Design a protein with these regions (language model features):
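N-terminal pre-domain/capping segments
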Residues: 1-110
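Active-site acidic/histidine proton-transfer and metal-coordination neighborhood
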Residues: 8, 42, 72-167
């Protein structure tokens, strides 16, 4: 419920909210390669945003996932010149997907990796697989300097996902 006190808090914080440009807003243009990853940095900078959130596959042939180390470094350098943060996103939580996203994040100087589990089957089995994925991220990348965000993209209830993260 919005109360007068809550409204005041919101107004006090509005100028410091960390707003990011999300590549999904440009999804079709990125699929058609009319907007490329580096373009997102320009758009975010022009709009005084904190940074960009970009999927490893956004931009098709020109996506971060298809860039070599030199190109990834150049992307990160441009973001730093523009004083922008980078959040890398991937659409799975299995090892290879996480490893790819983390490699890209580290090579671009990103601060965060967002992922979500995409499994189907018996709930008990799915929960077990997701728990293993989260454990892999924790054990492998806890000292990477990255922040990891798990997105609710399955038919799990919030408390189920929270309990998996807390394990």
């Amino acid at each position: 419920m919005v109360t007068i006190n809550n409204a005041r808090k919101i107004l006090q914080r509005v100028d410091t909210l960390p707003l990011y440009l999300h590549a999904y807003a440009f999804h079709l243009n990125m699929r058609l390669e009319r907007v490329l990853p580096a373009d997102l940095l320009d758009i975010a900078s022009e709009n005084n945003l904190r940074g960009v959130k970009i999927h490893v596959l956004d931009g098709e042939r020109f996506s971060l996932g298809n860039m070599d180390d030199k190109e990834l470094s150049a992307f990160g350098d441009k973001a730093r010149r523009l004083n922008l943060d980078i959040h890398i996103e991937t659409s799975a939580s299995y090892k290879a997907s996480i490893d790819e996203a983390v490699a890209i994040a580290l090579k671009t100087g990103a601060s965060s990796v967002r992922f979500y589990p995409r499994y189907e089957g018996n709930l008990r089995d799915v929960l077990s697989i997701i728990a293993n994925d989260i454990a892999y991220v924790r054990e492998t990348y806890q000292d990477s300097g990255l922040t990891f965000t798990i997105e609710q993209h399955e038919d799990l209830k919030s408390h189920e996902l929270v309990s998996l993260v807390k394990e």
